[in-house]
Regions:
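Surface-exposed, charge/polar-rich loops and edge strands
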Residues: 4-11, 17, 41-45
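Electropositive
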Residues: 34-72
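Mid-chain, well-packed structural core segment of small domains
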Residues: 58-93
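Arg/Lys-rich, often Gly-containing low-complexity segments of ribosomal proteins
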Residues: 88-123
């Protein structure tokens, strides 16, 4: 199993699909990364067939040019915290654990709010 960006990639998947298992890398970014190493790594290569050198090459590209995993998660959390600190509308919605992007809340808000909390004495 190849370890890229601190993640164990599934060994039987093609490398272009396996890169999507890294937080922050989707289809487009995976395709772009493989385009940068087009001479060395074929997108149809399975992860189990990668050499250590090829895995190292992927690691260096991901570290230099992309924010992935912990670094990206930390940035997103800091952005949310910043919204809360400045008291913006988005920050207020985050603080109250309500939908942030304009969805209705009269009925369909259960996903964001979580399970119902029943009060004692009410049926």
């Amino acid at each position: 199993m190849a370890r890229v960006a601190g993640i164990d990639l599934p060994k039987n998947k093609r490398i272009d699909v396996a890169l999507e298992y890294i937080y922050g890398i989707g289809k487009k970014n995976a395709k772009d990364v493989l385009a940068k190493v087009a001479g060395q790594i074929d997108p149809a290569t399975r992860v189990k067939d990668l050499t250590e050198q090829q895995a190292g090459l992927l690691n260096t590209i991901l570290q230099k040019e992309y924010k992935v995993e912990g670094e990206l998660r930390r940035e997103v959390a800091q952005n949310i915290h910043r919204y809360i600190e400045i008291g913006s509308y988005r920050g207020q919605r985050h603080r109250r654990n309500l939908p942030v992007r304009g969805q209705r809340t009269k009925t369909n808000r259960r996903t964001r709010r979580g399970r119902r909390k029943t009060l004692r004495g009410s049926a």
